[in-house]
Amino acid sequence: RNNVALCIAEGFEKDFSILCKDNQKVADAITTGLNMERFYVADIKGDIAGVLAISDCNGRAARAEKASLKKHFGFIKGIIGTFILKEEFEKQLEYPITTGYIEFVAVRKKYRKQGIAATMLQESMLLTNYQDFVLDVTDINNNAIKCYTSIGFEEFKRIPEKHGKQKGFNEKIFMRYCHK
């Protein structure tokens, strides 16, 4: 569980940096909120190389655990983190039960640029019963956009990001994959 959290912390290092720049501390803070039943893991010789989760309208892959966030980030940043992450992690998905929502796609730095994310996506989608899949990505994450496009995801919506300047991106791009 902690290794999955560490992979997420490293993969979303820039996003978590406003709360904490220490990946291990971020991992410790989010570990208790992970719903491991929703995660898929790429393992290379016993080392977690990458992770992703598939959620749906019946439940998400993570919760913002206020006590853990306060413990690891301090009182003020813990409260701020809870507020920010609750929206990101726990918002009810409005997609039908036939749609899988892919989130937390992350590959450890030492394993990047080896096709691991694409392989994880393809394999995990085959293991589910969803008819289609949706994910979102920031407009500045060009490597992820290329990866998703290469396996058949297509953009269907863009939403301007509130406080985008502070977050370092302007829009969230929503992409869909439909089984053929």
Provide a role label for each language-model segment.
Residues K109, K113-L126, K146-S150:
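Conserved acetyl-CoA-binding loop-helix of GNAT-fold acetyltransferases
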